[in-house]
Amino acid sequence: MAVDTFFVGALKGVGKVYLQTVLDCYSRHAWGRLYTSKLPITSVHVLNEAVLPFFEAHEAQVYTILSDKGREFCGRPDHHPYELFLQLEGIEHRTTKVRRPQSNGFIERLHRTLLDEHFRIKGRRTWYESVEQMQTDLDSYLEHYNTQRHIRAG
């Protein structure tokens, strides 16, 4: 499992928008949630609300998560919300080497795909006024990505 934070852009009247992405490197199933900050609690939220329930529904378990050393993922293990959450869930946390984004290449490629196939296209056609509107469109794209795109790609 790979996780990362991606800066999507800025919405007028809202501010900066970040995408918390999670990718199962084996199945290539992806999850994404948009937030106006990149805090540890948002990283926990996407795991707790979307990823772990998906695995539980499929009677599977997440054993390891790979992230960069961003402040939203790393800190003192006894105080950092993300680190504490992973400990409580029994998930091992591995980090990439500094300045080596290719170490987390699966998620970097997902970001490129999301940018090319979703954000750039929708951004030209749709005037978003809220993160919720953006999330609705992202959810539709991720549904396509997870169910249709890989069937054709093989």
Where are these regions (language model features)?
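Charged DNA-binding/catalytic regions of mobile-element recombinases
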Residues: 1-154
